[in-house]
Amino acid sequence: MIDLQLTPVSWQIMMVAACAAAACGLLGVQLVLRRRAMLGDAIAHGVLPGLVIGFVVSGSRDLFPMLVGALIAAIFVSILAEWLREHAGVDGGAALGVVFTSLFALGIILIEIFARDVDLDAGCVLYGMVEYAPIHQVEWFGYSVPRSLTPVLGALLLNLGATVLFWKEWKLCAFDPQLARASRLPFQTLEQGLLVLVAITSVACFEAVGSVLVIAMIAVPATIGHVLCDRMSSMVIVSTLAGVVSAVLGTVGAIQLETGVPGMMAVSSGGLLVGAVLLAPGRGLIPAATRNFSWTMRVEMEDILAESHLQSMDSPPDHTDSAGAPSSRFFRILATW
């Protein structure tokens, strides 16, 4: 029997995961509309050298210096990939692939050189440690909360504020970049600012959920919103809610199945995407097939009625023969479906 009663520790894990998913989902909409969702992948893998350099410079594994190093590396990844795309004539996907693979390999080499005897595991960057978030606590207004909630919630509030503040500008840049340039908007500044926010969000979520889940939470909830919605405002709301629902389902599922929360969150978001693709009222496969079948049956029924009418006008009424041909045709139509 499934026990859905969650402990306070489980609620804290869910809270951290939900804030991380919502923060990623807000920016994921902007990246999906620009067809650059894999930028989060590049940043998530490319920050490893920054983490190592932050450790080497500070001499400790304190959160702040390593986050600063990772943030600098993430901004460098986004700017370098954008520069290659704009000025070197390199395809956007190829530029991201070159940048993040090179920097991730560099990070592995730096770990082997400078941190071989230190418990600095690249796997923690990939998979996070959201299950251990309640271990490290800080005080908020007299309440004890997970330490990793501070950067994650900060990233969520920052992304929410930026989305509200630059709503019209980002919307124009996403749907009509040529008009945005012609309107004398600071197009490059707005796009670079978006990349910086992606970098900040990725770094803020690393300790909690790892780079793999950052990639999933940037791309999948926004894609769900894109499938279900025709307006950008609705897409942002649906994307954020899809991320939060994925966090809830992932946490509960991981507890019940005794597996990792980040992986279960990614699986949950993938399941929601499959459900959206199948059942979306406007674009879903099942509603589309139902509409096609309904229209086909309507056309065929009208043809049967027309044929019956013509037969009744051209020959004396013979109920057996006149109804036989249309009826047999109708059953043949059903047999094809």
Each model region followed by its residue ranges:
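Membrane-interfacial amphipathic/re-entrant helices at transmembrane-helix boundaries
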Residues: M1-A22
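Hydrophobic alpha-helical transmembrane segments
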Residues: M14-C19, F64-I72, A94-V98, L149-G154, ...
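Hydrophobic alpha-helical segments embedded in the membrane of multi-pass proteins
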Residues: A22, H45-G46, T101-S102, T189-I200, ...
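Short loop segments and helix-boundary regions at transmembrane helix junctions
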Residues: V29-L120, G225-I237, V252-M264
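Transmembrane helix-bundle core of multi-pass membrane transporters
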Residues: F104-A162
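Helix-loop-helix "hairpin" substructures at the membrane interface of multi-pass membrane proteins
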Residues: S144-A216
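Membrane-interface capping segments at transmembrane-helix boundaries
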Residues: K168-E169, L279-T290
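Short amphipathic alpha-helical interface segments
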Residues: R291-F331
